[in-house]
Amino acid sequence: CHAFYGFYTNPKKSQLTAVLTSDGGGDGVYNTVNIFKKGKFISINRSNKNWIGKIYSNTTLILGMNPFRHVYKVMGLAPYTQKTNYQKILNFFLNSLKVDKLDFKINSKIKDKYFYFKKNLEGYRFDNIAGALQNFTEIRLKEWFENVSKKFKVKNFVFTGGVANNVKANKFLSEQKF
C-alpha cells in the first residue's frame, strides 16, 4: 500500500524509479524495495529486518513519550546537541543495525527490541540520545539508498512509510547525489 501510494503521487512516473518503504512493521513487513521500470512495478525485496522505525519508536518510548504521536519531538530535539556529545550513543545505534546490500542485518545480541535499548541508553541525556538516533537514521537510510541506486542505476526515488515521515531524514536524503 505505501509503495503504490508513494509511486502514484510521484510527478516523475515516466522515469526509472526506486520505491522504498520503511516503517515500524505493523503488517509484519518493515521495508520494501520496488522498481518501476517501463510501466511495470517490480517488487525486489520485502523484509522484517529494517528496524529503523522500531528503534525510533522504542527510543521515543524510552524517553517517556508516546511512540505513536511524539516521534517528531525526538527528531526536533536532535539539533540541540553536538556530535561530540553523542558519538558513543551513535556507535551503539550503528552497531545495532547494519545495511546489508538491499536489506538490513540486526545485531544478534538483540533479543528484545525494547529492553536492549532501554538498558544501553540508561544514564544518557535525552538530547544526546535524540541527536544520535537522528544521525543513525540518516546514515543507515543513506547507505540503503546508495545500494539501491548502484544496483539498479536509479536516481529517482520515492520514499514512503512511517520512517519517511522524518522530515529531517528526507531533507538529508534529498541533498545526496545518488
Segments the model singles out, each with a brief description of its role:
Residues 1-178:
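Short acidic/glycine-rich loops and adjacent helix/strand connectors
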